[in-house]
Amino acid sequence: MNGGPAGQDAHRPVLLDEALDALAIRPHGVYVDGTFGRGGHAAGILARLGPEGRLWLVDRDPEAIAVARARHGDDPRCTIAHGRFDELPGRLEAAGLLHRVDGLLLDLGVSSPQLDSAERGFSFMREGPLDMRMDTSRGVTAREWLEQVDEKTLSRALRDYGEERHSRRIARALIRAREDGALPETTGALARLIAENVPGRPEPGKHPATRSFQALRIAINGELEALDALLERICDLLAPGGRLVVISFHSLEDRRVKRYIRKQSTVGDLPPSVPVAPEALQPRLRSVGRALRPGEAEQAANPRARSAVMRVAERLP
């Protein structure tokens, strides 16, 4: 999640200095910013790279890619690519960069510019159309998805992607509204309908629609599937000593990253009868330090930083 509130350095990423340090940037290295956003991390990486260094700037948001091209299109060190980060392995392989990436950074979730743009439809704090696509050049909008999804799938998405306890009740209300020709068309209308179907007192400091909006966004963008697909190829991309740095903003993402690093950091335990090459049993990553969260000062300056957690792993030889 790139950026902070207006009035400060509007697009300063959360844990910026910590992420740059964790990458252990070498002047001649090859690095990948898998979530360019508005370029805060990229600028920091480029400042530490020498003329022979290389940086891939990747984002699925056309607006972010436009910013990348405007700022770094003339920099010979930069390769700019529009697409999901799970498409990265194929692109890097085509460029001959398997096992040659010295650092890969992922700043997951929705960016502050996306949240702050009413037209994008990510936030109920600003009245706008129900879009929610991270890539506005393809895919269905949230409104289109709600027009065709069945109640069971919708309920499961709200439960699994939003950890919403009242997923069935909310799903039933949305399907009923659709059948009555009253399916919400704006973020505000959707938030109100959801709030009406969340019983009890709301959680302190959290709108009743927060979990559902997260779930819908994750579902229509395939965020967790993209993350899982990329993680499975990380060890094919990183050079020995290369770093993986991931900043997550909710437990669904962080659990996946934590589980992946743990799995790749342990020795395989298979029966002697299973014919596996010895190197296949060896750990491929080592966890670097503990999970890191923003300090009190950063959280006070940027409330969106409160849920952030950064994990780092290093590719073993």
From Swiss-Prot:
It catalyses: cytidine(1402) in 16S rRNA + S-adenosyl-L-methionine = N(4)-methylcytidine(1402) in 16S rRNA + S-adenosyl-L-homocysteine + H(+). GO terms for molecular function: rRNA (cytosine-N4-)-methyltransferase activity. Its main location: cytoplasm. Its EC number is 2.1.1.199. One of its GO terms (cellular component) is cytoplasm. The keyword Amino-acid biosynthesis does not apply. S-adenosyl-L-methionine binds at residues 39-41, 59, 85, 107, 114. Pfam families: Methyltransf_5. It is found in: Cytoplasm. Coiled coil: none annotated. GO terms for biological process: rRNA base methylation. SUPFAM superfamilies: Putative methyltransferase TM0872, insert domain, S-adenosyl-L-methionine-dependent methyltransferases. Keywords: Cytoplasm, Methyltransferase, rRNA processing, S-adenosyl-L-methionine, Transferase. The keyword Transferase applies. Specifically methylates the N4 position of cytidine in position 1402 (C1402) of 16S rRNA. Belongs to the methyltransferase superfamily. RsmH family. This is Ribosomal RNA small subunit methyltransferase H. It comes from Alkalilimnicola ehrlichii (strain ATCC BAA-1101 / DSM 17681 / MLHE-1). The lineage of its organism: Bacteria, Pseudomonadati, Pseudomonadota, Gammaproteobacteria, Chromatiales.
